[in-house]
Amino acid sequence: MRTLIVSLILLCSQSLGAQPVMVAVAANMKEAFTEIAAAYKTNNQSDFRVVYGSSGNFTAQIMNGAPFKLFISADEHFPLELYRQGKTINEGTVYAIGKLTFISKKSFNASSLKNKADLAKLIGNANKVAIAKPDLAPYGKAAIEYLKAEGLWELAKDKLIYGDNIGVATMYVVSGAADVGFTALSLASSADVAKETSYTVLDSKQYQPIAQRMVLMKRAPKEAIELYQFMQSPQAKGILQKYGYITP
């Protein structure tokens, strides 16, 4: 009987240990993080499950008990809010600075933009302008800041269609549901998106810096901590820079 109990305990322990570590990653990071995760796994056997989405939605889910152990956000606001609510080990760290990019269908040729007048013309000719929801996605918020700073908000506001995250907003342009839009450089420059679209990196002085922070949840396991540390390694930083991010 005692042997049976011990066997059951060991079986339960193994089952619990087999559960993958849940990692929440902002949608703008999908291409870069896919490569980072592959690099990490070459020397580590950690099993983790990655979910991509909007930083705002992840924050709400974590507040409501979602079992994420590492949150790689598209901004600082949402991770710091989780810290203030006592959900994280500490304030975490900024791992990258993102770049806002204007993207279009090939026929609109966003790469030819030289000035505000060119941008106004493209927006004026567009039927729909795609952005991420500004209350959920930092790149959507930055897009609105940019439009207002450039005096183009009135021209664009009635044409806006909103994606739940920056990945969805980008796909609106790729699919032709929108003629133009705003996205992250990391997505605009990815092979699958670039072959269908054209883009220009926008003046970063016209929106608040997109500082991207990551945080570990309280009681984060060793696997999450090791991945968090790898995100700050020279190898991971090199990948981030490849996708257009500025790294600390």
Residue ranges and their predicted role:
Residues 88-91:
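Short, P/G- and charge-enriched loop/turn segments at secondary-structure junctions
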Residues 3-14:
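Sec-dependent N-terminal signal peptides
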Residues 19-45, 49-51, 56, 60-66, ...:
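Exported/periplasmic ABC-transporter solute-binding proteins
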Residues 72:
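Short active-site segment of divalent metal-dependent hydrolases/proteases
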Residues 1-3, 17-20:
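Absolute protein N-terminus
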Residues 99:
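Active-site-adjacent helical/loop segments in soluble small-molecule enzymes
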